[in-house]
Amino acid sequence: MSEQVKEISQWIIKGDHDLGTAKITYFHIPEYLDTVTFHCQQAVERYLKAYLIFQSTSFRFSHDLIYLLDLIIQNDSDFENCYDTVSELQGYAVEIRYPNETIYLSNEIVDQAILIAKKIRDLVTEKVKIKIDYNEIIDK
């Protein structure tokens, strides 16, 4: 396994941990909507960074999903249709982590955040052609 494949795999696995944490939390403590959406955003961020490594594209470490998508799209227009969905998660990286920020969340928003993270994961793993087992038992 090349170093690049190893690094990509590590980023995907970290994203899977975030997505798994989001789903387990939502299942067991459904009131923690902010925590669930935060982990969905983190999962998408890590999946996008995995793809940037696949592209050999340098990036600054940032929670800005639009910035990461902009970099990806410079070399792969297949991600252009992700802007609208990924932008829904943009505010869940930092702002939602602080008590003085008010972001309205509902079960529908959380369900959508989980779905977005899963779709981005599917797109990235398909593109990088790395199969990483994903625990679908906890899927809702």
Which residues are covered by each model-predicted region?
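Terminal alpha-helical segments
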Residues: 1-140
